[in-house]
C-alpha cells in the first residue's frame, strides 16, 4: 500500500535498518547482497543536508564489503553502525510546541522493500 511520509522542510535525521529493510535479509552471508525494491530510489530521494544513519547487526568483519556495496550503488550514507543488537529499535523524541511530531516509525515487512514509501516535504508543517 503506497504511503507518503509527510515531513517539515527542516533538516532530518534518518535512522534505517539495513538487512531486511534496504537489502535482502542475510544476503551478505552468501556474498549476494541485493537491494530490495525501491530501496536505492528511496535513499536517493532523501533531501540533501539530511543526516543518514544505517544500523546493522552484521559483524565488524563484514564492514568493508558492506561499505563497498553501498558505495557501488551511489547512495549517500553518513554513518553505518555495525553489530547493533537484533531486538527492537526505540526512538524517543519530543513534539515541538507548534505540534510538529519529531519522530516517525515505518515498519515494512521483512524484505518488502520501500517502493511504496514516498518522501513529501510539506512547507506548511
Which stretches of residues belong to each language-model region?
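HAD-like aspartate-dependent phosphatase fold
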Residues: 1-125
Amino acid at each position: 500500500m503506497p504511503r507518503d511520509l509527510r515531513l517539515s522542510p527542516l533538516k532530518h535525521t534518518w535512522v534505517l535498518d539495513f538487512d531486511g529493510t534496504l537489502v535482502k535479509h542475510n544476503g551478505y552471508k552468501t556474498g549476494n547482497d541485493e537491494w530490495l525494491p525501491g530501496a536505492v530510489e528511496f535513499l536517493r530521494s532523501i533531501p540533501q543536508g539530511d543526516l543518514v544513519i544505517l544500523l546493522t547487526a552484521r559483524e565488524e568483519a563484514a564492514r568493508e564489503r558492506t561499505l563497498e556495496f553501498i558505495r557501488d550503488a551511489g547512495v549517500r550514507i553518513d554513518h553505518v553502525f555495525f553489530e547493533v543488537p537484533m531486538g527492537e529499535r526505540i526512538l524517543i523524541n519530543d513534539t515541538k510546541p507548534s505540534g510538529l511530531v519529531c519522530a516517525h516509525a515505518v515498519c515494512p515487512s521483512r524484505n518488502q522493500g520501500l517502493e511504496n514509501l514516498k518522501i513529501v516535504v510539506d512547507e506548511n508543517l
